[in-house]
Curated annotation (Swiss-Prot):
Keywords: Cyanelle, Plastid. It is found in: Plastid, Cyanelle. InterPro entries: Uncharacterised_Ycf23 (IPR007570). Pfam families: DUF561 (PF04481). The gene is ycf23. GO terms for cellular component: cyanelle. Its main location: plastid. This is Uncharacterized protein ycf23. Belongs to the ycf23 family. PANTHER family: PTHR36895, YCF23 PROTEIN.
Length: 243
């Protein structure tokens, strides 16, 4: 695991910036990456495209890159291009297209991925569609398969800003998953989907090691706005972890 990422995990202060599984707009992704690199963001998670990895790596060499996909064969050229982590997941954008994934699918994808890249740090998203008991069972199985990170998720509606005052009920599924998994397995857990400024600290109270932020950052117009938002997130996380 990259030393920078490992340190954030140990401190339970990891911030993962997600540009989007289906976002292949190089200019936009680099814009997000540059903003992330000027803050305490731990790494950026981008679409699994080798040329995109190369361009982001060239423009922002100090920011670790993770690539997300649901096709294991896509990971190999991306790692060769400079990606340091790989992730099976960030399914949000796929659910709206009717894509479904079940318990067995995840295990199969992990095994296929590990056969191709046995030593590359691997993160896996636990599908929110699974009942909580199956989510925990899947987490145990992922632990046996030496997965390095687990990400939780929940169903979210379109959001325009991380500053939106959203009711906590909208993120209860991902918080419940985070609490259950983070307190029962040794794999670090990242909580994602629907977090806002008012709820950004909650996952850390539930023993999460980090958070994933996507739409709220990517929908901002300027790099400066992205930097300001990520700095605000970092400040709140630092404050919450010292209390």
């Amino acid at each position: 695991m990259n030393n920078k990422i490992d340190n954030f995990l140990k401190q339970k202060k990891l911030i993962k910036v997600i540009s989007g599984l289906n976002n292949f707009n190089t200019t936009h992704v680099i814009k997000i990456a540059k903003a992330a690199s000027k803050t305490n963001a731990s790494f950026i998670d981008i679409a699994a495209a080798p040329k995109l990895v190369e361009k982001v790596k060239k423009e922002v060499p100090n920011l670790p890159i993770c690539v997300s996909a649901i096709k294991p064969e896509l990971f190999v050229p991306c790692v060769k291009a400079g990606a340091e982590l790989i992730e099976i997941g960030n399914f949000d954008s796929l659910y709206n297209q009717g894509y479904k994934i079940n318990f067995s699918d995840v295990l199969s994808l992990v095994k296929q991925t590990r056969s191709l890249l046995p030593d590359t740090p691997l993160s896996v998203t636990i599908p929110y569609l699974l009942p909580l008991n199956l989510q925990l069972e899947l987490a145990y199985r992922l632990e046996d398969l030496n997965v390095d990170l687990i990400q939780t998720e929940g169903k979210i509606n379109k959001i325009t800003s991380l500053l939106d005052n959203r009711n906590i009920e909208t993120i209860l599924p991902t918080l419940a998953s985070t609490y259950l998994i983070a307190n029962n397995v040794t794999i670090p857990v990242i909580c994602a989907s629907g977090l806002t400024i008012s709820t950004i600290e909650l996952p850390f109270k539930l023993n999460a090691s980090g958070i994933g932020i996507g739409n709220a950052v990517s929908k901002l117009n300027s790099t400066e706005e992205m930097i300001n938002l990520l700095n605000e997130i970092s400040t709140r996380i630092n404050y919450s972890t010292v209390l």
